[in-house]
């Protein structure tokens, strides 16, 4: 276990995930390539996880670790909806993931997630949660994974505060595709979803 703590390279993930928030809703986009080091383990990996009709998350890190945490969030969302007759706040999901990851120390989960959605408290919102349990609200956009440096450049250049949801879809797709051109850990196509108050979770053609 000390090797994981002492060598940051072990924590690098071969993927690109992007989240963009607009006044209309949120957009999540990812590539499809699943890697294990320099080995391409899968070419059609699904890296967007539907938590509820109003919430979803991107997956970056060790697949089993991320899946375990997102299963927990899915159960939390279901139980919250049954108990309160309302959708769980996105901040509650991010905070719960943060607590799970923080208290797993020293055996940390290798997971980095963008959790996004639309709720009654904050409207369209994005949170990022890393493997140490830190979580932050992202006011405009976020990217994780080995392709994120390239994706951030595209996002910084193209984001506008007044952009439409359709433009955000195009921007997120462009950011992931740019990362795929420069990052060997990313590739095989782009998956995109949107979440709005009116339509909820919806898969979009990239």
Swiss-Prot record:
EC number from the UniProt entry: 3.4.25.1
Taxonomy, superkingdom: Archaea
Alphabetically ordered keywords of this record: Autocatalytic cleavage, Cytoplasm, Hydrolase, Protease, Proteasome, Threonine protease, Zymogen
Function, as annotated: Component of the proteasome core, a large protease complex with broad specificity involved in protein degradation.
GO terms classed as biological process: proteasomal protein catabolic process
KW DNA damage (keyword) present: no
Quaternary assembly: The 20S proteasome core is composed of 14 alpha and 14 beta subunits that assemble into four stacked heptameric rings, resulting in a barrel-shaped structure. The two inner rings, each composed of seven catalytic beta subunits, are sandwiched by two outer rings, each composed of seven alpha subunits. The catalytic chamber with the active sites is on the inside of the barrel. Has a gated structure, the ends of the cylinder being occluded by the N-termini of the alpha-subunits. Is capped at one or both ends by the proteasome regulatory ATPase, PAN.
Compartments where located: Cytoplasm
Annotated catalytic residues: 15
GO molecular function: threonine-type endopeptidase activity
Positions of the propeptide segment: 1-14
Any single Pfam family the record assigns to this protein: Proteasome
Stated name of the protein: Proteasome subunit beta 1
Activity control note: The formation of the proteasomal ATPase PAN-20S proteasome complex, via the docking of the C-termini of PAN into the intersubunit pockets in the alpha-rings, triggers opening of the gate for substrate entry. Interconversion between the open-gate and close-gate conformations leads to a dynamic regulation of the 20S proteasome proteolysis activity.
GO cellular component: cytoplasm; proteasome core complex, beta-subunit complex
UniProt entry tagged with the keyword Ion transport: no
Catalytic activity: Cleavage of peptide bonds with very broad specificity
InterPro entries: Ntn_hydrolases_N, Pept_T1A_Psome_bsu_arc, Pept_T1A_subB, Proteasome_sua/b, Proteasome_suB-type
Family affiliation: Belongs to the peptidase T1B family.
